[in-house]
């Protein structure tokens, strides 16, 4: 794969990468960092991609790893409550999007990420298994349990 093909494929996957990163990190700045670092690493390791058909899956896995790297190395854990009014505003902005998205973002990551990858990004169960390094059965179970939790949380809302 040459530089031009790489650039085209990255541009095609950009929105998807952002949504996946956002489901893990929540902060736009951290998402941008994770995506930028992931793309750089992918370009540097392009020779390790065995099959061009799996480029997007491979790149998504790299970005997810970068998200986890940012979480591990974050030195600043600040509670929203320490900034009066800011926390409430941030939560209300998310809730204005839709109650379903709001509750989805509140799910535990091990349920949220497979649902985002499958329902929003359109990845197959097999691809999600490769990305998250899980069996297909485990992916199906997490999606099923995550949706059950969502239904339960949304019973009185929708």
Task: Say what each PLM segment does.
Residues 1-19, 23, 32-35:
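A short, charge-rich alpha-helical start-of-domain segment used by transcription regulators
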Residues 18, 28-45:
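Conserved RNAP core-binding helix
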Residues 37-54, 73-74:
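Sigma70-family region 2
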Residues 64, 132-156:
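DNA-recognition helix of helix-turn-helix
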Residues 9, 13, 17, 38, ...:
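Residue-level preference for hydrophobic side chains embedded in well-ordered alpha helices
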Residues 69, 76-104, 124:
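Internal acidic/polar
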Residues 50, 61-81, 145:
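Arg/Lys-rich amphipathic alpha helix in sigma70-family domain 2
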Residues 114-118:
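A short pre-motif secondary-structure segment
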